[in-house]
A protein has these predicted regions:
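Membrane-anchoring hydrophobic helices of lipid-metabolizing enzymes
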Residues: 1-41, 75-76, 80, 86
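Short hydrophobic/aromatic-rich motifs at helix boundaries and adjacent loops
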Residues: 22-24, 48-52, 70-71, 110-113, ...
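Catalytic core of membrane glycerolipid acyltransferases/transacylases, capturing the structured
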Residues: 35-93, 118-127, 131-133
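Short acidic/polar alpha-helix capping motifs at helix-coil junctions
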Residues: 15-17, 42-44, 61-65, 102-106, ...
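Non-catalytic C-terminal accessory region of glycerolipid acyltransferases
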Residues: 29-32, 36, 56-57, 93-214
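A short linear-motif detector with a strong N-terminal bias
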Residues: 17-18, 43-44, 67-70, 88-90, ...
Length: 214
């Protein structure tokens, strides 16, 4: 909770000390070559710091797809906090249209992909932790739309208030059509949760509905 509040005021200098990247240069190299990158992450450790610190280490604006919340004042406050180092926030309901309109300008997109999609929206199903689980369809169609490299961003707590981040390649542009990117994401997500179950946000209502509820 303290770190969440700290997200609103932490300086770029302090954040760089607290979140260490081992291979973000690989992403910058792709962007320098005008190649697109999609980063899939999760509610592991401090995802707010992960996104903020990523922007500080990237040479292009990070486009973050997010789900808005009903309280407009809190939503505006979160947008202000998340974008203060240059990231661009894209509301999930408008994401597809925004990306299609701006596809030539967009270099890198991030999505916290373990969130539960809205019940009425289209979704894909995979088994996560022995539970039939709904995921955003965008995890499947965005790599093909963008013709992007796809990375899984994993975060690990080193000590109190200090983390390391690693980017694992899931797919490349020439693999996207034939690869089950969502299944690979779920596999990496489950492995991460099992390795450090105490660092995943179990309270974010991941299994709010089943296939039978749809």
């Amino acid at each position: 909770f303290f770190e969440t509040i700290k997200s609103y005021s932490i300086s770029s200098k302090e954040l760089k000390k607290r979140v260490i990247f081992s291979d973000i240069d690989e992403l910058n190299h792709k962007l320098e070559k005008k190649e697109k990158v999609l980063v899939l992450t999760s509610h592991q450790c401090n995802w707010e710091w992960l996104l903020l610190a990523s922007q500080l280490n990237l040479n292009q604006p990070l486009n973050v797809i997010y789900k808005s919340i009903s309280n407009r004042n809190i939503d505006k406050s979160l947008i202000k906090s998340r974008s203060r180092f240059g990231s661009k926030l894209i509301e999930s309901k408008k994401a597809l249209l925004h990306i299609r309109r701006n596809i030539k300008k967009i270099g890198i997109i991030a999505l916290v992909a373990d969130q539960s999609p809205i019940k009425k929206n289209k979704k894909s199903w995979r088994i996560l932790l022995n539970q039939d689980t709904a995921f955003f369809k965008s995890v499947e169609y965005l790599p093909r739309l963008l013709n992007s490299h796809v990375y899984f961003a994993s975060m690990e707590r080193l000590s109190r208030g200090k983390y390391s981040v690693k980017f694992d390649l899931i797919s490349t542009p020439n693999q996207n059509l034939n690869k089950d990117i969502l299944s690979e994401y779920v596999r990496k997500l489950e492995h991460q949760i099992k390795q450090k179950p105490d660092e995943w946000l179990w309270t974010h209502k991941r299994w709010k509905f089943t296939r039978e509820d749809i």
